[in-house]
Curated annotation (Swiss-Prot):
Protein name, per record: Floral homeotic protein AGAMOUS
A single GO cellular-component term on record: nucleus
GO terms for biological process, alphabetical: positive regulation of transcription by RNA polymerase II
GO molecular function: DNA-binding transcription factor activity; protein dimerization activity; RNA polymerase II transcription regulatory region sequence-specific DNA binding
Gene name per UniProt: AG2
A Pfam family matched in the record: K-box
Domain K-box: 103-193
Length: 242
C-alpha cells in the first residue's frame, strides 16, 4: 500500500524525463499546479491498478488534494488494506527500525531546510553589502548586476508613482479652479439680480431711497425758469397810472 499527499509528497530532488531533467518542487501558479495534480493523480491511479493486476498485489492508494478532497483506489478494500498494514506493523519486529528510519528522514529534511534558510540569509546580507569577504570577483560582478537591475526597477516604480501623483494633483488643481470660477460667476449673477431688484419701482428699497441733498445751484437754476413776478407787478402799476 502506498500513501501520497500532494501537499507533502516526498520525491527525489530530480527526475529524469524524456525531454530532460526538471526540478521537482512546489508549483507556485495555482492553475498550473491544479492541472499537474490532475494529470499526475490519474497516472498514479493507473499505475496502482496496473501493479495490482500484473503482479497480483494488494494495493491501496489514498490521495488528498490541496482542498482536502479524497481520491482513493484499492483492488480489495482501502479499510481492509489499512487494517492489514496496522497488524503487520504491530506484529513486525522491525517496528523500531521503521521509526528510526522516519526520524532520520525528518532530520535530513530539517537539515535541508536549515541550509536553505542560511543561504537565503547570506544572500540578503550580500544584498545589503555585508559578508562580502568570501565572494569572488565573478560573484561580486553578479551581485552588482542584480543590485543595478533592482535599483532600476525601484526607480522606475518610484517615478511611475510620482507621475501618477503629479497627474492627480494637476487634475485636482484644474477641478478647484473650475469650481472657483463657477462660484465667482454665481456670486456676480446674484449681485446683478439684487441690483436689478433694488431699482425696480415698488420695491422697498426704491420707496425708502434717501432724498437728494440740497444744492444751491439747482435752486437758482430752478428759480430762473420761473416767471419774474416782480417786473410783472411794475408793469401793471405803470398801466394803472396812465
Amino acid at each position: 500500500m502506498s500513501f501520497y499527499d500532494d501537499q507533502s509528497g516526498n520525491l527525489s530532488p530530480q527526475r529524469k524525463l524524456g525531454r530532460g531533467k526538471i526540478e521537482i518542487k512546489r508549483i507556485e501558479n495555482t492553475t498550473n499546479r491544479q492541472v499537474t495534480f490532475c494529470k499526475r493523480r490519474n497516472g498514479l491511479l493507473k499505475k496502482a491498478y496496473e501493479l495490482s493486476v500484473l503482479c497480483d498485489a494488494e494495493v491501496a492508494l489514498i490521495v488528498f488534494s490541496t482542498r482536502g478532497r479524497l481520491y482513493e483506489y484499492a483492488n480489495n478494500s482501502v479499510k481492509g488494506t489499512i487494517e492489514r498494514y496496522k497488524k503487520a506493523c504491530t506484529d513486525s519486529p522491525n517496528t523500531s527500525s521503521v521509526s528510526e528510519a522516519n526520524a532520520q528522514f525528518y532530520q535530513q529534511e530539517a537539515s535541508k531546510l536549515r541550509q536553505e534558510i542560511s543561504s537565503i540569509q547570506k544572500n540578503n546580507r550580500n544584498m545589503m553589502g555585508e559578508s562580502l569577504g568570501s565572494l569572488t570577483v565573478r560573484d561580486l560582478k553578479g551581485l552588482e548586476t542584480k543590485l543595478e537591475k533592482g535599483i532600476s526597477r525601484i526607480r522606475s516604480k518610484k517615478n511611475e508613482l510620482l507621475f501618477a501623483e503629479i497627474e492627480y494633483m494637476q487634475k485636482k488643481e484644474i477641478d478647484l479652479h473650475n469650481n472657483n470660477q463657477y462660484l465667482r460667476a454665481k456670486i456676480a449673477e446674484n449681485e446683478r439680480a439684487q441690483q436689478h431688484m433694488n431699482l425696480m419701482p415698488g420695491s422697498s428699497d426704491y420707496e425708502l431711497a434717501p432724498p437728494q441733498s440740497f444744492d444751491g445751484r439747482n435752486y437758482i437754476q430752478l428759480n430762473g425758469l420761473q416767471p419774474n413776478n416782480h417786473y410783472s407787478r411794475q408793469d401793471q402799476t405803470a398801466l394803472q397810472l396812465v
